[in-house]
Amino acid sequence: MSGSVSGCGSGGCSIVWFRRDLRVEDNPALAAAVRAGPVIALFVWAPEEEGHYHPGRVSRWWLKNSLAQLDSSLRSLGTCLITKRSTDSVASLLDVVKSTGASQIFFNHLYDPLSLVRDHRAKDVLTAQGIAVRSFNADLLYEPWEVTDELGRPFSMFAAFWERCLSMPYDPESPLLPPKKIISGDVSKCVADPLVFEDDSEKGSNALLARAWSPGWSNGDKALTTFINGPLLEYSKNRRKADSATTSFLSPHLHFGEVSVRKVFHLVRIKQVAWANEGNEAGEESVNLFLKSIGLREYSRYISFNHPYSHERPLLGHLKFFPWAVDENYFKAWRQGRTGYPLVDAGMRELWATGWLHDRIRVVVSSFFVKVLQLPWRWGMKYFWDTLLDADLESDALGWQYITGTLPDSREFDRIDNPQFEGYKFDPNGEYVRRWLPELSRLPTDWIHHPWNAPESVLQAAGIELGSNYPLPIVGLDEAKARLHEALSQMWQLEAASRAAIENGSEEGLGDSAEVEEAPIEFPRDITMEETEPTRLNPNRRYEDQMVPSITSSLIRPEEDEESSLNLRNSVGDSRAEVPRNMVNTNQAQQRRAEPASNQVTAMIPEFNIRIVAESTEDSTAESSSSGRRERSGGIVPEWSPGYSEQFPSEENGIGGGSTTSSYLQNHHEILNWRRLSQTG
């Protein structure tokens, strides 16, 4: 993605450091650089910096194609995209500065903790070299520090946060037009590195993605126009249908910054005003619902900025005492779509086959993972990260924490969706299940979401043998209810004991990720996702040998579920049997649970007395995290292909345990005053 260019003026060139802002329209960093003179467009691929959040296969496919279109657009304007492969982004920036004689660097803000620390380091290092560094907001309607309550404190509830955003005294900035022309800087001495985003074994699977998706900023703009002029009108009506193709499909475009959220907001508000003038109540309702999903995306960045550990630990301190079930067989059955609950299984098979899930199905499978199987929420979040086309750290963390109950405004922990009821709610005719579970395609609609209750004659007529060609339920809901009840009792006992120990002075609190140091909350230990087998992408292989994680910590944190129609409770045990295939798993061996460490401490964050209004539970997943589903055919579910290094760093109790993540976040707290950072010019 390199080419010959003209040169730099006496004032030097300006480097535009592209990251997740892969567009030429409404790109403040690019616009500022164009105004300053000759421009060098740069993308640095440094996945090692991301640790275990290296993009998965489908995300890398998207990134590859998005960069290609960005380079094409830049060439049409007069320059090109320089790509660098590195293990250190800041070092690469310095190299490009030296080889091009650039005097300024422009980039747009990111809000995840690793990026915050990296960007601060970049500003320090480059400024020390005499390079002017400027950064801009290109990803949010308002910067996180702009949205506060009357006392200047960050909000702890989404409803209050979004209400404040909509009532700000000034509107979000209007989107910028793309530049008409770019004067290119001299890159004759700056050799571009070829970037490899896929290997030969992945190309076959990736080729299928191109049939349904078109990455790139211009394609994202077309998708936005199509949505606003079509499906938006009935968004509120159709978005809850699991088999619906009427949602926006904008989430991957938003994640990679191909579409400006400001442009989305402004165009949707124009529609809102027009429909209000026409008295179109259905249209107004759809606009409000869609804007709320945009608000949830904003909130995910807001939470990540104000609580940089939110992708790794719960924000409600007592939930760290919940005894998570450490069961790799359950995890494997969930990934394979072999839980015995059709809606859950259909969703997991679609996820692997397409890299996509409707947000309602994301809620269902996540809820089942956490509440019925009671597996550690970070396992599920990491699997989503590896397999989703629109994997987004901030949005995924918000979604899993909300569903799991670890956000202050989550639903109660003892409530969960009944997959059978949810099936008839979101897939009333069973079309979605039949598409992704062909073994159930002949089952009548009356039984499609609970085949275990179907008469034997009906099963025989449909060619179904439960426990053979389709599994019985992996665990009964009554049993799950009892287990959850026991686990919650144990959690509260441990929390009370820890509080008593702290009050007696025999246990010392640890610092919280929040800025309120007087409300300590212990940093959780991580789950190690071991690469026990080499990556395989052969679709003909069975899915029994998918990779599974192992636990390294002595304490796994708990979470609550999102929306629910059933109270499920959990029992304590010692180990779980293999995934059942021939019988309902009602009397399995005791499940293994992580033992809570005696020295763990908890402290509730004072501001987090949270509740979310009932209707928000229907739409708790941000549009950036999910927005719809396209029609695709089902198929064999192959092995889990991990995105990159699956090593979760093992950490000691508290902050500063020696892991990469911990040291990054320590640095974040030591150096971060982002208000000052963002204004450094």
Swiss-Prot record:
Pfam families: Cryptochrome_C, DNA_photolyase, FAD_binding_7. Keywords: Apoptosis, ATP-binding, Chromophore, Cytoplasm, Disulfide bond, FAD, Flavoprotein, Magnesium, Metal-binding, Nucleotide-binding, Nucleus, Phosphoprotein, Photoreceptor protein, Plant defense, Receptor, Sensory transduction. Light exposure induces a conformational change in the C-terminal domain CCT1 required for activity. ATP binds at R239, D359, R360, D409. Disruption phenotype: Prevents the shortening of period at 27 degrees Celsius, resulting in a long period phenotype. The double mutant cry1 cry2 is impaired in blue light signaling, resulting in long-period, lower-amplitude oscillations at 12 and 17 degrees Celsius and completely abolishing rhythms at 27 degrees Celsius. Plants show reduced root and hypocotyl elongation in an anion channels activation-dependent manner at the plasma membrane, as well a reduced anthocyanin accumulation in blue light. Impaired blue/UV-A wavelengths-mediated inhibition of shoot regeneration. The keyword Isomerase does not apply. The keyword Transcription does not apply. Changing D21N: In cry1-401; genomes uncoupled mutant (gun) with defects in plastid-to-nucleus signaling. Its cofactor is FAD; (6R)-5,10-methylene-5,6,7,8-tetrahydrofolate. Disulfide bonds join C80-C190. Induction: Expression levels display circadian oscillations under constant conditions, with a high amplitude and an early phase, with maximal expression around 4-6 hours of the light phase. Induced by light. Transcripts levels oscillate weakly and proportionally to temperature, but protein levels are stable, with higher levels at low temperature (12 degrees Celsius). Accumulates in response to low blue light (LBL). Mg(2+) 2 binds at K241, S244, T246. Autophosphorylated; in response to blue light and when in complex with FAD cofactor. Kinase activity is optimal in the presence of magnesium ions, about 30 percent of the optimal activity in the presence of manganese ions, but inactive with calcium ions. Adopts an open conformation when phosphorylated upon photoexcitation and thus interacts with signaling partner proteins. Residues 1-489 are annotated as: CNT1, binds chromophores to sense blue light and mediate CRY dimerization. Mg(2+) 1 binds at N238, T246, H358. GO terms for molecular function: ATP binding; blue light photoreceptor activity; FAD binding; identical protein binding; kinase activity; metal ion binding; protein homodimerization activity; protein kinase activity. Residues 583-598 have a biased composition (Polar residues). Residues 525-598, 616-664 are annotated as: Disordered. GO terms for cellular component: cytoplasm; cytosol; nuclear body; nucleus. The modification Phosphoserine is found at S616. GO terms for biological process: anthocyanin-containing compound metabolic process; auxin transport; blue light signaling pathway; circadian regulation of calcium ion oscillation; circadian rhythm; defense response; detection of light stimulus; flavin adenine dinucleotide metabolic process. NCBIfam families: crypt_chrom_pln. Homodimer. Interacts with ADO1, COP1 and PHYA. Interacts specifically with the dark/far-red (Pr) state of PHYB, but not with the red light-activated (Pfr). Interacts with PIF4 and PIF5 in the nucleus in response to low blue light (LBL). Binds to SPA1 and SPA4 in response to blue light, this interaction prevents SPA1/COP1 complex formation and thus avoid COP1-dependent degradation of the transcription factor HY5 by the proteasome and promotes hypocotyl elongation. Interacts with TCP2. Binding to ATP mediates conformational changes which facilitate flavin binding. Belongs to the DNA photolyase class-1 family. Photoreceptor that mediates primarily blue light inhibition of hypocotyl elongation and photoperiodic control of floral initiation, and regulates other light responses, including circadian rhythms, tropic growth, stomata opening, guard cell development, root development, bacterial and viral pathogen responses, abiotic stress responses, cell cycles, programmed cell death, apical dominance, fruit and ovule development, seed dormancy, and magnetoreception. Implicated in promoting R protein-mediated resistance to Pseudomonas syringae pv. tomato (Pst.) DC3000 under continuous light conditions. Promotes systemic acquired resistance (SAR) and PR gene expression triggered by P.syringae. This is Cryptochrome-1. It comes from Arabidopsis thaliana (Mouse-ear cress).
